[in-house]
Regions:
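Mature catalytic core of soluble alpha/beta enzymes
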Residues: 2-18, 23, 27, 31-346
Length: 346
């Protein structure tokens, strides 16, 4: 090694003496060795961050070279989740959604452009899902007791009354004045089918704007998005989809890379009554919990899309889903049938 070191200190000295070729080779080897040493990357920093919003925990796991920058990006993304909660919450009295629910039957309510745009998207989802997705499902969720967290079996008359006070066609949007109006009294918007997915997408945009290219963002565990890949795993972020009947078992394993996953299952919120299980996944057309599925998982480019469509696919079943799902969606259906196994739609 001593001749090589001398060559690095003064390459001209080496090259003044024969054999010149040998000297040049030594010099090149030494330079290459130093280059390798200089470019050895430091292991990436891992940061985990969480914030409570929309009644659940939003979690972020991210990697990068600079801990300070990661912390700033994670805090900014968390603030975005809190901001959206204050826009869409039906528990915060001064949120935009609460104001609409209180006043939109009495008079048109002017809302922010962001809120208006999201409502327009929700109306499109309702049309495309044949009404199986309906953001006006609030009265139905209330009469079934899911707002209180426990759930109970309502009388048929209560369900009928709730159905008469909902319906996406009874929401009037005025783009020119950016207003929302309800055509029926007692209506209320419920953000449960869109809020987490929308927030996750906004958090992802914030992280990318801060230069983050490796992160996993989770909204309550049921709606997640993987940015890039974690270190040493080019396939993406490892995600286990649990078995709907047994949490200790696995229905499927996937790797998320620049895509989202959302799952709707009858094990998330439910109650027992008269010997039956009643899930929180309501069919807004009938007023009763949907049956026939245990869980549905959707992989889509946006978390808003995967979260929203998980419920119509759950409600409408395999055949409808196979006919209508976009080609860039992947759907795992776990049907509630004896001996049935979870299967990905082709």
């Amino acid at each position: 090694m001593r001749p090589v070191l001398r060559t690095l200190r003064d390459p001209r000295r080496c090259c003044r003496h024969p054999p010149l070729a040998r000297c040049l080779v030594l010099f090149a080897i030494a330079c290459a060795g130093l280059a390798r040493c200089a470019t050895v990357p430091k292991p990436p920093v891992k940061l985990e961050h969480s914030v409570y919003a929309m009644g659940t925990e939003f979690g972020i796991a991210l990697y990068g070279p600079n801990a300070t920058k990661l912390e700033g990006a994670a805090e900014q993304a968390s603030e975005e989740a809190t901001r959206i909660d204050h826009m869409l919450s039906n528990y915060i009295p001064d949120s935009e959604l609460s104001k609409v629910n209180r006043e939109a039957y009495d008079h048109p309510v002017q809302v922010s452009q962001e809120f208006f745009d999201l409502l327009e998207v929700c109306m499109r989802y309702s049309r495309e899902s044949d009404g199986s997705f309906d953001i006006t499902v609030g009265p139905l969720m209330k009469v079934w007791g899911f707002y209180k967290g426990s759930g109970h079996l309502p009388h048929r008359a209560e369900i009928w009354t709730a159905l008469n006070h909902m319906g996406y066609r009874n929401v009037e949007l005025d783009a020119a004045h950016r207003t929302v109006r309800f055509k029926e009294s007692g209506m209320s918007l419920d953000p449960g089918g869109v809020g987490k997915g929308y927030a996750v997408d906004k958090m992802v945009s914030d992280l990318r704007a801060h230069g983050v290219d490796s992160a996993l963002v989770s909204g309550g565990g049921s709606s997640i998005y993987g940015i890039g890949s974690p270190p040493n795993e080019p396939r993406g972020w490892y995600v286990r989809i649990r078995d709907a009947k047994d949490e200790s078992k696995t229905a499927a394993v996937i790797y998320l890379k620049d895509s989202s996953l959302s799952t709707s299952g009858n094990y998330e919120k439910f109650f027992f009554a008269e010997g039956k299980i009643y899930s929180h996944i309501m069919d807004p057309r009938t007023g009763y919990p949907a049956t026939g599925m245990l869980s549905v998982s959707v992989i889509a480019p946006r978390t808003l899309d995967s979260e929203v469509w998980a419920k119509p696919y759950y409600i409408l079943g395999r055949q409808w889903t196979a006919r209508h799902k976009p080609s860039d969606f992947r759907v795992l259906l776990c049907e509630d049938k004896p001996g049935a196994t979870c299967k990905w739609l082709p």
